Amino acid sequence: MTMKKILTFLLMTLTFATAKAQTDDEYRMEIGAGVGLVSYEGDFNGSVLSNMQMGGSVVLRRIFNPYMGVKMAAMYGKLTGSSKDVKTYYPDFVSNPYSFSNTLVDASVTYEYNFWPYGTGRDYRGAKRFTPFVFGGLGATFVTGGGNNVFTANVPLGLGVKYKIGPRLNLGLEWAVHFSLSDKLDGVKDPYNIESSGLFKNTDCYSALQLTLTYSFMAKCRTCHNADE
């Protein structure tokens, strides 16, 4: 079998499998909100669990099939930290400790993959109400406070679990780390006074632990859900 025939066969198989999966899920979209804790991870934070602040988000999710989806989210929170919280020696802040409290706005688009087919079991044979999942994507970060404004990109990576409460309600718990491209989310660039290079070398990041609740809508088979729509 030639390479061209093999590629054609694989493409046809993938197209058929995707089309079959897309006809099995009930709803195309989810919309909802999340609430949880946001934590700054950078030069002025000694622990992942330190300086956690309340945060909230709005979520819009496009469902491709019981395994895959794309989530668009906007998150609001606070980033706080202090040089007193770390054991690292910073020459500039020995006599005058540094602290900050900045406002964070994050917008991201992430690809999600469910380890098990997700659903009620009626729309897709073998679907489960509970599944763990992983996600990753791209985001934008805007931080303001202390007279400084920072706008940069970030790479969110995370994992979570979700549970289908009912045909239209979905409960999720997720944790993500947002790796930013800036070292000034805390208002200070390179407090070590050592030049560094590389895409993520000595840059700041932040994590978010959130509980989300979403509502499913836009039925794929409208004639099957006229009573619900």
What are these regions (language model features)?
Residues 38-40, 77-81, 116, 139-143, ...:
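Structural signature of outer-membrane beta-barrel domains
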Residues 66-147:
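Gram-negative (and chloroplast) outer-membrane scaffold detector with strong preference
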Residues 21-61, 210, 214-220:
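Short glycine/proline- and aromatic-enriched beta-strand/turn motifs that initiate or cap beta-hairpins
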Residues 26, 63-67, 116-118, 164-166, ...:
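Outer-membrane beta-barrel channels and translocator barrels
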Residues 27, 50-54, 103-107, 128-130, ...:
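Residues that define the transmembrane beta-barrel architecture of outer-membrane proteins
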Residues 33-37, 58-62, 109-113, 136-140, ...:
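Residues on the lipid-exposed face of transmembrane beta-strands in outer-membrane beta-barrel proteins
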